[in-house]
């Protein structure tokens, strides 16, 4: 093997190039790669954090929806109870009003019956007086008396 000056010159140039690359070219490349790696890691961490926040938000939304459903069902149940109570109150009021109207109608009917009886008594008394008057005006014989009673009976 033949070693000559060209080989040494090439070795020196190679070593200078290697030193220059290590000193000036390699650090910016390493920094760029490190920055890129850091950006990728930050992006992945942000994606994981976003995914975790999204999952937490989904859980909160599900809980709030469940709570809203429960609240809605509770409000519906309360409204049904209030409606039932109002219906019962209206029914009780209607029954009381019906009982009052029936009692009032019975009282009015009773008053009318009493008035009719009094009027009938007055008429019967007048007819009895009239019949007695007619009997007393005529002779007292059996056939005339029977005829007058039949006539009074027909008038009643």
From Swiss-Prot:
Membrane-spanning ranges: 7-29
Indicate yes or no for the key word Transcription regulation: no
User: Where does it localize?
Assistant: Cell inner membrane
Membrane topology of the entry: Single-pass membrane protein
Q: What is its main location?
A: membrane
What's a single GO MF annotation on this record? proton-transporting ATP synthase activity, rotational mechanism
One cellular component GO annotation, for this chain's record? proton-transporting ATP synthase complex
The reply to whether Membrane figures as a keyword in the UniProt entry is yes
- Domain of life of the native organism: Bacteria
UniProt entry keywords in alphabetical sequence:
ATP synthesis, Cell inner membrane, Cell membrane, CF(0), Hydrogen ion transport, Ion transport, Membrane, Transmembrane, Transmembrane helix, Transport
Q: List the PANTHER family.
A: ATP SYNTHASE SUBUNIT B (PTHR33445:SF1), ATP SYNTHASE SUBUNIT B', CHLOROPLASTIC (PTHR33445)
Family, per entry: Belongs to the ATPase B chain family.
Functional description taken from the UniProt entry: F(1)F(0) ATP synthase produces ATP from ADP in the presence of a proton or sodium gradient. F-type ATPases consist of two structural domains, F(1) containing the extramembraneous catalytic core and F(0) containing the membrane proton channel, linked together by a central stalk and a peripheral stalk. During catalysis, ATP synthesis in the catalytic domain of F(1) is coupled via a rotary mechanism of the central stalk subunits to proton translocation.
Spell out the subunit comment. Answer: F-type ATPases have 2 components, F(1) - the catalytic core - and F(0) - the membrane proton channel. F(1) has five subunits: alpha(3), beta(3), gamma(1), delta(1), epsilon(1). F(0) has three main subunits: a(1), b(2) and c(10-14). The alpha and beta chains form an alternating ring which encloses part of the gamma chain. F(1) is attached to F(0) by a central stalk formed by the gamma and epsilon chains, while a peripheral stalk is formed by the delta and b chains.
Q: What's the protein name?
A: ATP synthase subunit b
Q: Which organism is it from?
A: Burkholderia cenocepacia (strain HI2424)
